[in-house]
Amino acid sequence: MAGISEVPVATADRLRGEGHRILDVREDDEFAAGHIAGAVHVPLMQIPARAAELDRDADWLAVCRVGGRSLQATAYLSRLGLRVANVEGGMEAWSGAGLPFEGAAGGPGRVI
């Protein structure tokens, strides 16, 4: 989508270390199977109803499984004035790059 900020996973990991927040827009079962530690979980279909819960002063990185749903969330939230970038390739790329993520109760995660 034109005008939407996207970042590769290595950049997203660096930005996360610098204080950017992670917004995971996958479904509950996907999030439970594996997610980036500290991620805020709001499934894509709940974004319109729950956007007000997101810190408007934060810089956000949106993620899903491969990047499509998070791109939609990024476009919507950007129109609302939030500072948000899409993580290219989503959790598949994150996992493929060997970046850390966890499953339920802090155990090993997997991408479904």
Predicted regions mapped to residue ranges:
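Short, surface-exposed ligand- or partner-binding patches at beta-edge/loop junctions that are enriched
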Residues: 63
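Rhodanese-like catalytic fold shared by cysteine-dependent sulfurtransferases
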Residues: 1-21, 27-60, 68-112
